[in-house]
Amino acid sequence: MLPPFIIDGRNTAEIFLANMDYAQVAGAVVVQELIDGIQNDYLEEVKRKYAERFFVFGMFDFFNGSPVRQVEELYGRGFRGIAIPGHRLILNDRRVYLNSPEMMEMFKLMERKGMILSICLAANHQQMDEIKEVIAECPELKIAIGHFGMVTQPGWEEQIMLARNKNVYVESGGITWLFNSEFYPYPSA
């Protein structure tokens, strides 16, 4: 839900910064979502203009091209984190497995470069074995499990338990999205 003062549907970096200043928030993390489209060009500009205020995650085309090449290119553009909406990698006609050879090579590249992975996982344990393999193979890769483990979906508790591993964290930024019908203070969250 957008605040009423955003009349054109665009929450630009400048509008967001004004709200951050008003709320006395020093910095923010921007994680992309596939439903909004890949926004690397805009976020690269935001990162350049407001590097001290925003940490931005890049995103790539998961269904086309080499994950390694795309992440190398994003790293070259200054992105130090990659967002993967894992729950959107499972389609009726195709699927990208997190532990496929191409994806594992990409995760190892991210680990070597000191990048951060922000990932949302599918419900019902569909990707748990895959992400556990990533965690085991890339123990130095910093991983943020998104949307508090997709707390409104079955199997979220197992996602939270992943934080028992070194360098695996849980972020709660998606609470406002998952509980958007309630509005602040999100009583059932």
Regions found by a protein language model. Name each.
Residues 81, 96-189:
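Catalytic pocket-lining loop regions of alpha/beta-barrel enzymes
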Residues 1-105, 109-113, 153, 162:
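Mid-domain alpha/beta scaffold segments of enzyme catalytic cores
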